[in-house]
Amino acid sequence: MELWAQLKQAGLESSGLGPLPQALRMPPPEGNPGQALMSSGAEFGGARELLLWIWEELGNLRRVDVQLLGQLCDLGLEMGTLREELVTILEEEEEDDDEEEQEEEGEGKNCVEENKGLQGKQGEKCSGNPYPAQRLPDFEMTI
């Protein structure tokens, strides 16, 4: 199956699954077991109907197996895509956090420089504390 091959190429094949079963690698068998019974000339009675029923059920099970395998492969590929998107999002958030930290460090330095320049006067952006994250909370905030 081509989806199985795509899973392998994407590195998403589970090690516990093992190789694709031979019954799913090959096309479904052609023909009808009833034809072989009729050509042999043997009279099997109810066994023929039972064999035909078993043959049909095996065909139905094979179709369901193929459908389920296709769905499993689709889900695996979708999970791989989602995993890549998650990694990208996490990397972007990490970069944003790093930029914010650098900006905060830059603002802290600016506050120190402004405080020195104003000689004790409080600037508009600076609270007088060179490290805004370490300032005491407002009284109203603590109530």
Curated annotation (Swiss-Prot):
Signal peptide: none annotated. Residues 107-116 have a biased composition (Basic and acidic residues). Residues 90-106 have a biased composition (Acidic residues). InterPro entries: DUF4530 (IPR029202). It comes from the Eukaryota. Residues 90-143 are annotated as: Disordered. It holds the Pfam family DUF4530. PANTHER family: GLUTAMATE-RICH PROTEIN 4. This is Glutamate-rich protein 4. It comes from Rattus norvegicus (Rat).
